[in-house]
């Protein structure tokens, strides 16, 4: 263990005497080096603050000159926080004495992490009320600094269910209707977490029922997450609304004075909210803050029922909520009709939404139809662009796959993938997950068929080819973006999945016309000139063993001679270069694949091409490999190649004296 690591470990473990022994008598330069970042990215001061070692913190700052602002990496709840200052770490862990000490020694109260999280947000996240009070009350920490997602301290307090912190922030003037980058408010966070008491608190401070970027109100957010208590509270009939036929109160639309809707109408520092939800501001009832229309209540109950089907797996509970929704639709003799679907969907087995009480009651004998109803309801209310819509379609497909109904699974997954590609940005994580699921499913089914023979489930060319075509389309869409996707891990993964689908296509029978279609699609991919990590082309990736690791479950095995041949047949350049000037031949040599090397050479790859380190592919072959002795590089070297290497070796100037295509040939060597 080196001295730097020993200092870090002593600070982490709170061993002050050992730390003093290691650091005493050191020069300023040595102290700066020893109290700086270690290999993991943290500093001794940061880790001491993280674990609350006050004496170590003060020693490092006062005696060793450690910077109270130096950020680093620190671990919390299984996550690595980058660029965290010591004050952030102490606040997140709730060490009030360390927080006081660091602030007395000049730490900035609003200094943020790499994701723009402040010490105040860190304290709010884990519910450290005393730290929050100290940061705000004694040092005027900014309540409104949001993280990179636009999520504020009030929002995270609501989401985590820290009622007293939320109350305190509101008393200090936190903006109750502030919106995040995705348009959600603190009310949405309460609804998603099921924090009814905090939701009542916010409504008492004039929180508005806004729609977020997906068109979701807090009421719908509660339905999606299955928080029945929030839904029941928000849809209860409101006093003072107009009466409908039959003498029952009908919930009406919100009537709110805009002048009082921008948070708590109190000066900063004045008490904003009452001491309990039963004592609202200005004598107003909480109910008057959140009247809900009949249509909104119906949709909330229908969506809640869908959540009971798919998330809670409670079909009887779902029926109960759907019955209430149906009663509301027919309330007072004025029927609220459902919109007619533009067309029936094969993936849903051509199901229609029920429209009468009789149709609804008939569902109790058909659980599968109930599950289709849940998918139909969710798509109607949330729309195709909401992540939950496609997520639960895929979830239902996975359930079918688990029971061996792969055909039904594939239909649902294809429908979800079409929905994602039509509504989400290219290479969104959800779309990438869909492609990977397809590859893993196809691999499993093809292995199952091989094991069971004709009894296995049939996966045909059309299934694989359909997904491959969509994968190539996704790459084309990504390359049309204004930013360059080549360095994106998601883009590399998309290319790898396409190669795995090509690998699997070898295992299904193809007619000549289908083979032609496959080659056309691969040609489209190559024409895009996509590049993955380190500038890898698809041909580089096909000869690299790391391409095998694409998900949790095995799909194809790489390097793959079959995939290499398909790519070469479709026009892949065997002399293409990555960022280190490696050709696919170099990568094949690094992976000890002489058979693939021979295929590349036969396709015109230059055996004597050198990479950025002036190594040929032959020189990269494992010396212990038997095939190295059988490969004769000079059998593939032309006189032209030797001349090019001689020019390079002797540093003979050639640029401007020969044609440009010859210049490129010399640079290859």
UniProtKB/Swiss-Prot annotation:
TPR repeats lie at residues 298-332, 390-423. Induction: Frequently down-regulated in rhabdomyosarcoma. InterPro entries: Ankyrin_rpt (IPR002110), Ankyrin_rpt-contain_sf (IPR036770), TPR-like_helical_dom_sf (IPR011990). Signal peptide: none annotated. One of its GO terms (biological process) is proteasome-mediated ubiquitin-dependent protein catabolic process. Keywords: ANK repeat, Cytoplasm, Mitochondrion, Phosphoprotein, Repeat, TPR repeat, Ubl conjugation pathway. GO terms for molecular function: EP4 subtype prostaglandin E2 receptor binding; molecular adaptor activity; ubiquitin-like ligase-substrate adaptor activity. Pathway: Protein modification; protein ubiquitination. ANK repeats lie at residues 2-31, 40-70, 82-111, 115-145, 149-178, 182-211, 214-243, 534-576, 580-609. Changing residue 500 to Y: Found in a patient with polycystic ovary syndrome; uncertain significance. Belongs to the fem-1 family. Component of a CRL2 E3 ubiquitin-protein ligase complex, also named ECS (Elongin BC-CUL2/5-SOCS-box protein) complex, composed of CUL2, Elongin BC (ELOB and ELOC), RBX1 and substrate-specific adapter FEM1A. Interacts with PTGER4. Interacts with NFKB1; the interaction is direct. This is Protein fem-1 homolog A. It comes from Homo sapiens (Human).
């Amino acid at each position: 263990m080196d001295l730097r690591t020993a200092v870090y470990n002593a600070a982490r473990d709170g061993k002050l005497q050992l730390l003093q022994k290691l650091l005493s008598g050191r020069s300023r330069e040595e102290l700066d080096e020893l109290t700086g970042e270690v290999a993991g990215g943290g500093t001794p001061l940061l880790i001491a603050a993280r674990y609350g070692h006050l004496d170590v913190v003060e020693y490092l700052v006062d005696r060793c000159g450690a910077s109270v602002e130096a950020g680093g990496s620190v671990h919390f709840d299984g996550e690595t926080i980058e660029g965290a200052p010591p004050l952030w770490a102490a606040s997140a862990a709730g060490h009030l004495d360390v927080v006081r000490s660091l602030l007395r020694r000049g730490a900035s109260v609003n200094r943020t992490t790499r994701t723009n999280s402040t010490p105040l947000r860190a304290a709010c996240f884990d519910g450290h009320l005393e730290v929050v009070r100290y940061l705000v009350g004694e040092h005027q920490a900014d309540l409104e600094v949001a993280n990179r997602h636009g999520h504020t301290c009030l929002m995270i307090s609501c989401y985590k269910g820290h009622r007293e912190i939320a109350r305190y922030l509101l008393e200090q003037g936190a903006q109750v209707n502030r919106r995040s980058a995705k348009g959600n408010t603190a009310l949405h966070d309460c609804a998603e977490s099921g924090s009814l008491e905090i939701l009542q608190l916010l409504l008492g401070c004039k929180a508005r029922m806004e729609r977020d970027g997906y068109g979701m109100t807090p009421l719908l957010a509660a339905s999606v997450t299955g928080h029945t208590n929030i839904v029941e509270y928000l849809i209860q009939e409101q006093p003072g609304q107009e009466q409908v036929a039959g003498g029952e109160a009908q919930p009406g639309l919100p009537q709110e004075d805009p002048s009082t809707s921008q948070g708590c109408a109190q000066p900063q520092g004045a008490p904003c909210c009452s001491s309990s939800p039963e004592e609202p501001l200005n004598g107003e009832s909480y109910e008057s803050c959140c009247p809900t229309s009949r249509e909104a209540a119906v949709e909330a109950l229908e969506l809640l029922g869908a959540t009971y089907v798919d998330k809670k797996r409670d079909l009887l509970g779902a029926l109960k909520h759907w019955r209430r929704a149906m009663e509301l639709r027919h309330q007072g003799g004025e029927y609220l009709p459902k919109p007619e679907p533009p067309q029936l969907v094969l993936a849903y087995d051509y199901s229609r939404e029920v429209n009468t009480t009789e149709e609804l009651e008939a569902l109790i004998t058909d659980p599968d139809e109930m599950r289709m109803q849940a998918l139909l309801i969710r798509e109607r209310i949330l729309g195709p662009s909401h992540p939950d819509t496609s997520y639960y379609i895929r979830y239902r497909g996975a359930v079918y796959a688990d029971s061996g109904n792969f055909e039904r699974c594939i239909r649902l997954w294809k429908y979800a993938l079409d929905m994602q590609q039509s509504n989400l940005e290219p290479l969104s994580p959800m779309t990438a997950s869909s492609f990977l699921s397809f590859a893993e499913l196809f691999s499993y089914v093809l292995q199952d068929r091989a094991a069971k023979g004709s009894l296995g489930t049939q996966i045909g060319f059309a299934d694989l080819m359909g997904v491959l075509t969509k994968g190539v389309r996704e790459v084309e869409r990504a390359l049309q973006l204004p930013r360059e996707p080549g360095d994106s891990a998601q883009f590399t993964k998309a290319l790898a999945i396409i190669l795995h689908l090509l690998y699997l296509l070898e295992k299904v029978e193809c007619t000549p016309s289908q083979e032609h279609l496959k080659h056309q699609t691969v040609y489209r991919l190559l024409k895009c000139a996509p590049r993955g990590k380190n500038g890898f082309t698809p041909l580089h990736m096909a000869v690299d063993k790391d391409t095998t690791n694409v998900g949790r479950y095995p799909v194809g095995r790489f390097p793959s001679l079959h995939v290499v041949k398909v790519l070469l047949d479709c026009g892949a350049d065997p002399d293409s270069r990555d960022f280190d000037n490696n050709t696919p031949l170099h990568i094949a040599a690094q992976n000890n694949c002489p058979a693939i090397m021979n295929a590349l050479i036969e396709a015109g790859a230059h055996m004597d091409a050198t990479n950025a380190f002036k190594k040929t592919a032959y020189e990269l072959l494992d010396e212990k490999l038997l095939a190295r002795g059988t490969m004769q590089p000079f059998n593939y070297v032309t006189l032209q190649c030797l001349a090019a290497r001689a020019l390079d070796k002797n540093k003979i100037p050639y640029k401007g004296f020969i044609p440009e295509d010859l210049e490129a040939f010399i640079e290859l060597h």
